[in-house]
UniProtKB/Swiss-Prot annotation:
It is found in: Cell membrane. Signal peptide: none annotated. This is Uncharacterized protein Cgl0250/cg0304. GO terms for cellular component: plasma membrane. The lineage of its organism: Bacteria, Bacillati, Actinomycetota, Actinomycetes, Mycobacteriales. Keywords: Cell membrane, Membrane, Transmembrane, Transmembrane helix. The chain crosses the membrane at residues 4-24, 44-64, 68-88, 106-126, 138-158, 166-186, 196-216, 230-250, 258-278. Disulfide bonds: none annotated. The keyword Transmembrane helix applies. It is a multi-pass membrane protein.
Amino acid sequence: MQSNLLAVLFALASALTIAWGTVVRHRIALRTPKDGSLRSSPLLNALMTPMWWAGMSTAMLAYFLQTVALGFGTLLVVQPVLVLSLMFTLPLSARFNGYRLRRTEIFWATLLTVAVGIMIVLGRPLPGNPHPPLDRWIPVLLVGVAVMGGMWLLAEYVLKKDKALILGLVTGALFGYVAVMSKAAVDLFVHQGITGLILNWEGYGLILTALLGTIVQQYSFNAGELQKSLPAMTIAEPIVAFSLGYLVLGEKFQVVDWEWIAMGIALLVMIVSTIALSRTSTMPAGSKR
């Protein structure tokens, strides 16, 4: 059953739960020692922390709500709504870490959210192919592996100062792939039942990509302040998901003439807002405890 209203409501609930889980896992990352020992591994340190598992449980609930939303609406409807998690995460992070958001941060975060909202309201997305052929998937998967692998190497060995930002982009891109695979898996389940999920590769690819995204996300949290990595994740995920929704699933925006200009401006505002947020840091050093 297609219902954009239900899709938006479930996506909004997902955004709310994403925010809390993100803040919890980032606080754990800030407590991780950076002495090069095995104990300093962001992933191992997180796995040994009960609150991380609480945060992950919240993240799983958020993902379940996102999946339900995808059952009611297209990827191009659900994905932009999830960017609202940024509006909830930044104030929560400020509250838990004992600092105050600047007006400029609030301005850019609001502008980012408004821009994404314009894209969904003006775009009026149409559904695509519920089960695209494999030859549509292979090129985008190969390109994704090459680009994200290259970005990881840059963050590790070349652009260490911007490691949190770059890993945030990689995380967002991975979850963009997760979003598309989620939509494909949901459509498989709706049309073919559990047998369709078992006999097709999309469900297994979804699990693998989601696991990889969670690991990279924890490393991005450990690499720096939340204001560095979170905006990058927030902007990369819908852009990658939009692109794959067009290329793989065949979903389309109902946009004509001047509306394309408005959509382009909204996309530009999204990018500028993300850069502005990623370059702003209000968390005092003393809060990293």
